[in-house]
């Protein structure tokens, strides 16, 4: 399909006048039938890279996603725009699943979102063969790599897709992956001479800061105070931590609520919607929050505890400032976090998992303790060269370094 048609589809379905960097080239490669590897940081517009080609071509595109809530959000948005999309997952009752499968048999859909464990069932694979998919897109593709920060064993089975579906083009997408993880994704999925697209990890509007944690509540309130009425996310490492902090913030006059995987789905959804509508100023969350959250005006992200790895930290801070305006990313650092994280790592049964987790934590600690430009340390981790001498935004570039205890 010629580019002008893609542009009109971009406008009519998604409401955009122009592509973001790399999107058009990725879409052209997909429509040419190539395997494609996409590394695009959070907020760069990854989803469009498989959604638009799916709508531009005949037949069905399969989208593998590990996140049930995100599946529903994306399908709802596509359906609202008039795009024929559906999902199959464990939230559907038997009758609704049958209805959707019937629609797939009749060719009524162009996009099917499905979790990896459902996709790899033999019954699903037999149906897929009869639906003759034109492309398989694998979102969060870093989950296939044992060297990544979010390895999921069910993703490993996706390696069989190439054997089962032969020459069907595949697109692997991720927001964060080191060189080693990228190579592992290509190898595990058996991508054949893939077109590789790597967007820049540089977010010049984000002002990274690491400060010694002394009184977490007081320090969190100080950051919120600088952002009067503006939206922010505070990440905590435990579910209890999110609830305690949200309660303390409310006592101090801040509209805040918790978000974690232990809450029931309705309460989580309610808090998420309230945050997006600006009825809440602050969400106190575990890493369960944020995947696919489309809120461009988050002005600050605070990490009350040390994250387990730099990939996760980069992705979570990347939820700030998606509108391109400046935003603060503050990490409260205390050496006791390292001891605690190390204890969790040593409880893992698998020695390889322990070794990878130790290495990832070590790199996170290096970032926290570094006197170098924060942007440089982050970009270096993702093998991207930072050309500037000084980012003129992070604490290390703007002010002398305080020594940690």
Question: What are these language model-derived features?
Answer:
Residues 360, 365, 369-405:
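Cys/His-rich short segments
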Residues 2-13, 17-21, 25-47, 55-57, ...:
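Helicase motor core with emphasis on the C-terminal RecA-like subdomain
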């Amino acid at each position: 399909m010629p580019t002008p048609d893609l542009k009109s589809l971009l406008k009519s379905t998604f409401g955009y006048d122009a592509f973001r960097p790399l999107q058009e080239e990725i879409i052209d490669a997909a429509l040419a039938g190539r395997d494609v590897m996409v590394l695009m940081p959070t907020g760069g517009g990854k989803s469009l890279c498989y959604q638009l080609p799916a709508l531009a071509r005949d037949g069905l595109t399969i989208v593998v996603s590990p996140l049930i809530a995100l599946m529903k959000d994306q399908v709802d948005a596509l359906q609202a725009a008039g795009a024929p999309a559906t999902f199959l997952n464990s939230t559907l009752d038997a009758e609704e699943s049958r209805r959707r499968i019937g629609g797939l048999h009749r060719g009524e859909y162009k996009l099917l979102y499905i979790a990896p464990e459902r996709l790899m069932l033999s019954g699903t694979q037999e149906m897929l063969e009869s639906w003759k998919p034109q492309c398989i897109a694998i979102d969060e593709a870093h989950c296939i790599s044992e060297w990544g920060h979010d390895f999921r064993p069910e993703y490993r089975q996706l390696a069989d897709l190439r054997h089962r579906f032969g020459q069907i083009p595949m697109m692997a997408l991720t927001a964060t992956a080191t060189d080693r993880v990228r190579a592992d994704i290509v190898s595990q999925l058996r991508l054949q001479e893939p077109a590789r697209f790597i967007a820049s990890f540089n977010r010049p509007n984000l002002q990274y800061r690491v400060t010694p944690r002394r009184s977490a509540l007081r320090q969190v309130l100080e950051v919120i105070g600088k952002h009067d009425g503006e939206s922010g996310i505070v990440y905590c490492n435990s579910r209890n931590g999110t609830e305690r902090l949200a309660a303390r913030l409310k006592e101090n006059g801040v509209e805040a609520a918790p978000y974690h995987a232990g809450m029931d789905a309705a309460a989580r959804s309610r808090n998420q919607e309230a945050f997006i509508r600006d009825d809440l100023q602050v969400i106190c969350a575990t890493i369960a929050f944020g995947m696919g959250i489309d809120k461009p005006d988050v002005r600050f992200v605070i990490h009350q505890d040390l994250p387990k790895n730099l990939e996760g930290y980069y992705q979570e801070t990347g939820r700030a400032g998606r509108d391109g305006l400046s935003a603060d990313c503050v990490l409260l650092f205390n050496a006791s976090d390292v001891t605690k994280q190390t204890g969790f790592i040593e409880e893992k049964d698998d020695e390889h998992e322990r070794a990878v987790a130790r290495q990832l934590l070590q790199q996170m600690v290096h970032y926290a303790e570094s006197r170098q430009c924060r942007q440089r340390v982050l970009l270096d981790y993702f093998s991207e060269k930072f050309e500037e001498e000084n980012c003129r935004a992070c604490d290390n570039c703007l002010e002398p370094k305080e020594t940690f205890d």
